Amino acid sequence: IVEAGTPSPWISRLFDEIGHKEIVANPRKLGAIYKSDNKTDERDAEMLARIGRFDPKLLHAIQHSSLKHQRDRKVVDAREALVGVRTKLINYVRSSLKSFGIFLPKGTSAATFAKITKEHLSDKDYLLFESAIQTIAELSERIKEAEKDIDALIEQDYPEALRLQAVAGVG
């Protein structure tokens, strides 16, 4: 019995490869685990074992995605992480500039933020934020590359996603 978590897909595949039957328990469906006030790995493992021995159905077993699907999902996750980092940097620069009384035009897109920011700052002010602004520009390029990778992946392996992208506001 394995508790679902970050390493559980790998552990599940490893058990399959060596011929062991595993149950990947969904801890969110097990109040005895996620509602516990005195959580430890040892107590959780013991509780999973006891429940599994009593009635495995109570573990609400999950089935992990295939390794291919897991890898494909990481392409999307990487893009999401890049967007998150870029957003934090943009918010940092915007709020810092406001403290100097500098306000960027409304509607400045994340993709053009670096260019527009450079156009609206004096050389002296630009130097204060140069590394952040250049990083934002580089992140925007990396995000474009990630989007191309995702589009290629969709076209090659997930054509059903193209239909979702055809609906305005979706995908």
Task: Name each model feature, range by range.
Residues I1-G171:
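A detector of single, family-specific signature residues
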